[in-house]
């Protein structure tokens, strides 16, 4: 009798596990500003097709009220589309997942504006043929990788939301944050030019750019962990993640690792 009860309990457990609804995460790479091929209405229509329970935005908590409504409606595609969507479907929940205080953090550590100043200096050196052949090859490849992405970003969103485009984004960002440091870490121009941080300390372009490189990893890894935390708190829900499409490859790569062995499915917005 006890054996029969035990078998029944095991069967019930197995069946309940099989019928437990999977959590779905749909990462949508976006263009932040309205364009003819992608605007807030485009994104709203995508959300209509998906019918998510949660929409996660590339913002930190400072942009939200205590009940997770926008403090202000931005003119970004995401802000306008989300506002329109929750007005129509008020039970849908918005959540932030961005690295907290991203911009202040970058300014305070000195990675901004040294990142932009550094890439401008590399470009200037290349234009007057002061880079070595190896350095020029790195910089030219970095610039060339942007061209196909500009073309893809001018097409329908399926064109910049797929593994092929993700791989181009990954290579382009690798060149920006890893390969360009082979120039900045070698050439004296980047060790002898400085920016003054808000606290009065000086930081070289070389050190500032290295911090920018490190922050690219830290930011994306943190965003993926935040997405995962929200997902695990809301089992069985359909969760849309909105991100600039250049972040998509990194976030998806991290989520694949974080969701391994869990009842969570990663999907494209156009998959049924």
Predicted regions and their residues:
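A cross-kingdom marker for long, charged
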Residues: 210-272
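Proline-aspartate-enriched helix->loop->beta-strand connector
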Residues: 51-57
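Hydrophobic, often amphipathic alpha-helical segments used for membrane interaction and targeting
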Residues: 78-232, 254
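Boundary/entry segment of secreted carbohydrate-active catalytic domains
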Residues: 20-37
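Solvent-exposed loop/turn segments at secondary-structure junctions
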Residues: 31-34, 60-64, 100-104, 245-248
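Sec-dependent signal peptide recognition
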Residues: 2-8
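Membrane-embedded segments
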Residues: 36-50, 62, 68-72, 84-85
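Bacterial Sec-dependent signal peptides at the C-terminal "C-region" and cleavage site
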Residues: 11-23
């Amino acid at each position: 009798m006890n054996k029969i009860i035990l078998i029944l309990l095991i069967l019930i457990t197995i069946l309940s596990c099989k019928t437990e609804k999977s959590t779905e995460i749909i990462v949508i790479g976006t263009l932040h500003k309205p364009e003819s091929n992608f605007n807030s209405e485009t994104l709203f229509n995508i959300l209509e097709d998906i019918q998510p329970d949660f929409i996660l935005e590339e913002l930190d908590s400072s942009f939200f009220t205590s009940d997770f409504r926008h403090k202000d409606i931005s003119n970004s595609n995401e802000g306008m589309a989300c506002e329109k969507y929750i007005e129509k479907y008020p039970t849908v929940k918005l959540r932030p997942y961005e690295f907290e205080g991203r911009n202040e953090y970058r300014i305070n550590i000195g990675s901004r504006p040294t990142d932009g100043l550094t890439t401008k200096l590399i470009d200037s050196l290349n234009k007057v043929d002061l880079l070595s052949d190896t350095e020029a090859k790195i910089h030219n490849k970095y610039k060339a990788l942007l061209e196909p992405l500009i073309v893809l970003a001018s097409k329908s969103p399926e064109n910049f939301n797929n593994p092929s485009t993700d791989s181009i984004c990954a290579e382009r960002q690798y060149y920006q944050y890893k390969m360009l440091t082979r120039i900045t870490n070698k050439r004296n121009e980047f060790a002898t030019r400085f920016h003054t941080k808000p606290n009065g300390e000086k930081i070289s372009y070389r050190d500032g750019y290295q911090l920018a490189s490190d922050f690219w990893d830290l930011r994306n890894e943190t965003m993926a962990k935040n997405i995962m935390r929200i997902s695990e708190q809301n089992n069985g829900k359909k969760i849309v993640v909105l991100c600039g499409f250049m972040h998509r490859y990194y976030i998806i790569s991290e989520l694949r690792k974080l969701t391994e062995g869990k009842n969570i499915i990663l999907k494209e917005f156009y998959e049924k």
